[in-house]
């Protein structure tokens, strides 16, 4: 299952789901199914923003080695690629398509599907990586290999199955020029989740421990924020930035959706009258605002100081009903809504009070059909 939300020619919110008999694409607001293809079981469905271009990985005899690039509007297959080992993830933006295998990442020019580079990685069985959605700040983040360093006290009590070959260090890679930019010391435990903001100027990280969420400036790697999800370990399922980078939402195995406020960004937007509750400004203004704050925050919080500060708790939160199940979240089209999709086929919408925070009210609940394959 893949959950995708982005402003594109207005506002859009799309949810794509791979199922045992094909795949579906839903519009979240207003809710409705906008595409359904009956075929074999589909394990990966990735959309290029709100376009008709979709990357699919079918469960072909269980090997998951074939990638198809589909135009859903024309019902045509643009290309097919077969890989030596199973595909674990596919990432794409307007410039690049990445095919993620356990020990390689293939980098393609999406305009002609020419293979540009193959990155050799450590064994990354959970495909922990992120591709910036921004075509100018076009970066890939993925884990460095673990050097078997001893863990510090309090960092080894995670109840989750660890991606043990993966370290807590992030490699930042320029996928336009095909070169490594820097390494970021993010966590002691193995990395579990990575996410860029819409501009590619911030990177959020979480480890297998799941207690701490950190945000770094990109490409410098300067630590900007540190948030505490909870006092007990948990498995982090997803991280997503608000479109203007003022908020961050996190889902985990606790069934609580945490929403953190990036205070310096939020305060700057408030001064400029660019808060999400205001009439939506031009995207370029939001981008300039969030970019300018990167330098400002970095100036106030050098890494040696920010590492000593107590992590902040969530600003707002929501509870997912029912049994514990894997979930993913993203901010909805009116920017005060957090949409949460669960792997048992439910879509929940929660409203965030941007002034007071606290518990978010559920405003919608829809069933999105079959459980994802």
Swiss-Prot record:
Assembly: Component of the PI(3,5)P2 regulatory complex. Interacts with atg5.
PANTHER family with a match to the protein in the record: WD-REPEAT PROTEIN INTERACTING WITH PHOSPHOINOSIDES WIPI -RELATED
GO cellular component, one term: fungal-type vacuole membrane
SUPFAM superfamilies linked: WD40 repeat-like
Species this protein is from: Schizosaccharomyces pombe (strain 972 / ATCC 24843)
Domain of life: Eukaryota
Motif L/FRRG motif: positions: 227-231
Biased composition (Basic and acidic residues): 144-154
UniProt-listed PROSITE patterns: WD_REPEATS_2, WD_REPEATS_REGION
Effect of residue 228 to T: Impairs localization and pre-autophagosomal structure formation
Principal location: membrane
Domain notes: The N-terminus might form a beta-propeller domain involved in specific binding to phosphatidylinositol 3,5-bisphosphate (PIP2), leading to the association of the protein to the membrane. The L/FRRG motif is essential for the cytoplasm to vacuole transport (Cvt) pathway, for the recruitment of atg8 and atg16 to the PAS in nutrient-rich medium, and for its recruitment to and dissociation from the PAS under starvation conditions.
GO terms assigned for molecular function: phosphatidylinositol-3,5-bisphosphate binding; phosphatidylinositol-3-phosphate binding; protein-macromolecule adaptor activity
Knocked-out gene: effects: Impairs atg8-processing.
Described purpose of this protein according to its UniProt entry: The PI(3,5)P2 regulatory complex regulates both the synthesis and turnover of phosphatidylinositol 3,5-bisphosphate (PtdIns(3,5)P2). Necessary for proper vacuole morphology. Plays an important role in osmotically-induced vacuole fragmentation. Required for cytoplasm to vacuole transport (Cvt) vesicle formation, pexophagy and starvation-induced autophagy. Involved in correct atg9 trafficking to the preautophagosomal structure. Might also be involved in premeiotic DNA replication. Required for the recruitment of the atg5-atg12/atg16 complex to the preautophagosomal structure.
Region of interest (Disordered), ranges: 142-163
Places the protein is found: Preautophagosomal structure membrane; Vacuole membrane; Endosome membrane
Protein name listed in UniProt: Autophagy-related protein 18
């Amino acid at each position: 299952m893949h959950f995708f939300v982005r402003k594109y020619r207005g506002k859009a919110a799309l949810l794509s789901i791979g199922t045992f008999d094909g795949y579906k694409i839903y519009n979240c607001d207003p809710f409705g199914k906008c595409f359904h293809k009956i075929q074999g079981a589909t394990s990966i469905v990735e959309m290029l923003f709100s376009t008709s271009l979709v990357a699919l990985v079918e469960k072909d005899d269980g090997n998951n080695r074939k990638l198809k690039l589909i135009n859903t509007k024309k019902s045509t297959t643009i290309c097919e690629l077969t890989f030596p080992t199973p595909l674990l993830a596919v990432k794409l933006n307007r410039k690049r398509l990445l095919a993620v295998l356990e020990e390689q990442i293939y980098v393609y020019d999406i305009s002609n599907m020419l293979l540009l580079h193959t990155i050799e990685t450590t064994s990354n069985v959970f495909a922990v990586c992120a591709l910036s959605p921004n075509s100018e700040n076009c970066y890939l983040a993925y884990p460095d290999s673990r050097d078997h360093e001893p863990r510090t006290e309090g960092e080894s009590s995670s109840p989750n199955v660890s991606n043990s070959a993966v370290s807590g260090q992030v490699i930042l890679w320029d996928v336009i020029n095909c070169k490594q930019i820097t390494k970021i010391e993010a966590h002691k435990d193995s990395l579990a989740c990575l996410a860029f903001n819409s501009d590619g100027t911030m990177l959020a990280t979480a480890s297998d421990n799941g207690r701490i969420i950190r945000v770094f400036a990109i490409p410098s790697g300067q630590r900007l924020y540190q948030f505490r999800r909870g006092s007990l370990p948990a498995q982090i399922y997803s991280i997503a930035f608000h479109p203007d980078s003022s908020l961050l939402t996190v889902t985990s195995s606790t069934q609580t959706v945490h929403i953190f406020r990036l205070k310096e960004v939020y305060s700057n937007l408030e001064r400029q009258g660019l808060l999400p509750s205001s009439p939506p400004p031009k995207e370029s203004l939001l981008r300039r605002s969030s970019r300018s704050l990167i330098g400002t925050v970095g100036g106030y919080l050098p890494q040696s100081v920010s590492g000593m500060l107590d992590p902040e708790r969530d600003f707002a939160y929501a509870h997912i009903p029912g049994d514990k199940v894997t979930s993913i979240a993203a901010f909805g089209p009116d920017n005060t809504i957090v949409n949460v999709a669960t792997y048992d086929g439910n879509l929940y919408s929660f409203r965030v009070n941007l002034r007071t925070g606290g518990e978010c009210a559920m405003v919608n609940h829809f069933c999105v059909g079959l459980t994802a394959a």
